């Protein structure tokens, strides 16, 4: 009997969150280990479908770095990175677009649909969903000066066609977006998936942005998870060395999204089964929430 009572208590805990998020949009960046492990893939698909069935509008933006690396290796193309960004020449861009739009996107869409969803795959080129310009990477030189480096067909999103996404939402579909953007001349751009998720969330004024990662969230210097971070404390946490390395662009992405109108953003542990549901519908969550 106790386990039944526990289930009832879990449902009661979720009720205010179901009411709060009903009719709202949640943008989820899907990547990392959650895309490789079969149990986690199924868990993610069921979480997204559950959100839709509860009247919430999930929008999925996926990555695909490991799949890109594998395919580039097969073609004998060696990747170079500048501050974590892949230098993307024309040959590399062809592979990136092929993998993200023709392989990974279709796999994610197929998995959601196999589990009862109504997912529709998109790239940023469809309906000019993600209009981009070339991103120049700033690199600090030995003499302290900062130089803008051209890293090829790497883009920054300057405009999101939110009408296309909203049309799909109103039709009860789940948009699944590959992070390939389009330039003014029709050229393709490789765009960081976290950046795409943040820009899409901002354009939609989403209730929440969720980034799935392979870590528990943001930790303090003692290694303890910071479950909540106020927006105005982020610069100090970076200066103090609490937020470091690859976590800085993720947190910055969340900050930018909130400043563009997103209510809250979370960096969560995608290695946890049903991490999305646990983050949204429980009091504690499974990562770090960033808010005003």
Swiss-Prot record:
Swiss-Prot/TrEMBL site (Transition state stabilizer) positions: 29, 250
Pfam families: AA_kinase
Keyword check for Transferase: yes
Annotated transmembrane regions: none
CDD domains assigned: AAK_NAGK-C
Pathway(s): Amino-acid biosynthesis; L-arginine biosynthesis; N(2)-acetyl-L-ornithine from L-glutamate: step 2/4
Keyword annotations: Amino-acid biosynthesis, Arginine biosynthesis, ATP-binding, Cytoplasm, Kinase, Nucleotide-binding, Transferase
GO molecular function: acetylglutamate kinase activity; ATP binding
Residues binding substrate, per UniProt: 64-65, 86, 190
Stretch forming the signal peptide: none
Reactions catalysed, as given in the entry: N-acetyl-L-glutamate + ATP = N-acetyl-L-glutamyl 5-phosphate + ADP
Keyword Transferase: yes
InterPro entries listed in its UniProt record: AceGlu_kinase-like_sf, AcgluKinase_fam, ArgB, Asp/Glu/Uridylate_kinase, Glu/AcGlu_kinase, NAGK-C
Subcellular location(s) of the protein: Cytoplasm
Single GO biological process annotation from the record: L-arginine biosynthetic process
Membership in a protein family: Belongs to the acetylglutamate kinase family. ArgB subfamily.
UniProt function note: Catalyzes the ATP-dependent phosphorylation of N-acetyl-L-glutamate.
Name recorded for this polypeptide: Acetylglutamate kinase
Organism: Geobacter sulfurreducens (strain ATCC 51573 / DSM 12127 / PCA)
Gene: argB
